[in-house]
């Protein structure tokens, strides 16, 4: 009887060691993959200051193209039942010939009908095809996807990004926007095939005070993909220590003017 107990104890110990090694390997592999996530923006020496240009006329020929880039809304795609409604940009955008651009695609789910978005393979393929068409546009150096992912939509968007990354030219950066709360305590951004997840540190709703307190206390975003850039608004100044090495995406509620650049916080430059 004692021999069987001893054998059982030895076997239990071996199983525990194997389980520990397996668990540690998975953790190390995940951390290793995070460290090796490419940053194509750095590879192509992309400017660190980027102005968002939404659906309105924008005259940005005053920008220094060595310091500033422009992320312009190229299209809005609305998921309606089992279809995709295409809304192209209709407002003019004027920039210098050498200004580098990011083509932004906004994806929304139609919520005014009784039928929710199907989130099926056909819709996903339509989205990918339409997004890919923005890559060859003049002066476009990168692609950005802007969406609000409900918990039930996350798997759809994850596979969308995975398939989109596979079809994009390897040298084109893929960016996405992310709620700041995702960057602090949500694991769903893990292993997404993007070069950055831009934390939107403005218009944060009920999370605003909590997140601003978290950042002004000297804390940083826990998700590595969120530690490559900031998404801020000109009319919502933040008292945080900006990391100057990170890209800053800046939103303005009105069309940009040269005077607006003077209002940018010194830490943003």
Regions found by a protein language model. Name each.
Residues 1-12:
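N-terminal Sec-pathway targeting helices
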Residues 11-19:
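Bacterial N-terminal signal peptides
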């Amino acid at each position: 009887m004692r021999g069987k107990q001893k054998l059982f104890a030895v076997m239990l110990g071996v199983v525990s060691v194997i389980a520990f090694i397996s668990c540690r390997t998975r953790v190390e592999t995940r951390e290793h993959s995070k460290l090796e996530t490419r940053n194509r923006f750095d590879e192509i020496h992309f400017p660190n200051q980027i102005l968002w240009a939404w659906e309105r006329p924008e005259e940005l020929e005053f920008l220094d193209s060595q310091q500033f880039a422009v992320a312009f809304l190229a299209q809005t795609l609305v998921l309606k039942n089992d279809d995709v409604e295409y809304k192209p940009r209709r407002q003019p955008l004027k920039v210098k010939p050498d200004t580098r651009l990011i083509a932004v695609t906004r994806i929304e789910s139609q919520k005014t009908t009784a039928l929710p978005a199907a989130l099926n393979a056909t819709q996903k393929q339509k989205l990918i095809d339409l997004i890919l068409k923005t890559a060859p546009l003049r002066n476009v150096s990168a692609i950005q996807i802007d969406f609000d992912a409900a918990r039930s939509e996350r798997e759809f968007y994850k596979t969308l990004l995975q398939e989109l990354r596979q079809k994009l030219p390897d040298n084109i950066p893929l960016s996405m926007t992310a709620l700041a709360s995702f960057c602090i305590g949500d694991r769903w951004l893990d292993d997404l095939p993007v070069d950055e997840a831009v934390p939107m540190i403005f218009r944060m709703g009920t999370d605003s005070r909590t997140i601003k307190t978290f950042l002004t206390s000297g804390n940083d975003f826990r998700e590595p993909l969120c530690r490559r850039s900031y998404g801020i608004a000109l009319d919502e100044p933040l008292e945080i220590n900006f990391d100057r090495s990170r890209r800053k995406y800046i939103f303005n509620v009105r069309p940009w003017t040269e005077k607006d650049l003077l209002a940018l916080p010194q830490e943003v430059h």
